[in-house]
């Protein structure tokens, strides 16, 4: 019989896209003074927010997954398992797998964690994180067309 799987909770970061008043672009009054959140910033916010929301200690996490589509092209960072581990010192040396499946990357990461729990893992952490505003519309469209 398969083990039952429970989702304890999660966290959603604030969306700051190109139409958001806090999005920094060349005509924004803070242009040159501050920058938009990076992919790594969102990973840290997602992980720490989920741990706080669920009351789970990072040390209790046995395995983790991160879903992302072409982080290496939008953010020059493809090795996102290390970025997730960097979100909390108690995640150091935990196995983390990046899952990529275009628009389904986060969902596939979640499905992978569910299967791991059914196989015996007690506590898994999943993050789905994207930053796709680092390129021009033309470059971004070209990258997204690769899906």
Task: Locate the predicted segments by residue.
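Active-site-proximal alpha-helical scaffold in enzymes
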Residues: 97-130
């Amino acid at each position: 019989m398969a083990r039952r799987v429970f989702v304890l909770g999660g966290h959603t970061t604030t969306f700051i896209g190109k139409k958001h008043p806090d999005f920094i672009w060349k005509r924004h009054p803070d242009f040159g003074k501050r920058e938009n959140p990076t992919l790594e910033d969102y990973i840290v916010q997602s992980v720490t927010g989920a741990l706080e929301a669920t009351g789970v200690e990072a040390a209790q996490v046995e395995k983790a997954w991160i879903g992302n589509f072409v982080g290496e092209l939008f953010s020059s960072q493809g090795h996102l398992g290390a970025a997730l581990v960097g979100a909390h010192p108690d995640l150091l040396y935990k196995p983390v797998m990046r899952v990529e499946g275009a628009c389904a990357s986060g969902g596939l990461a979640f499905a992978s964690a569910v299967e791991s729990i059914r196989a015996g893992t007690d506590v898994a952490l999943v993050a789905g994180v994207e930053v796709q505003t680092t390129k021009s519309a033309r470059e971004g469209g070209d990258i997204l067309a690769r899906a």
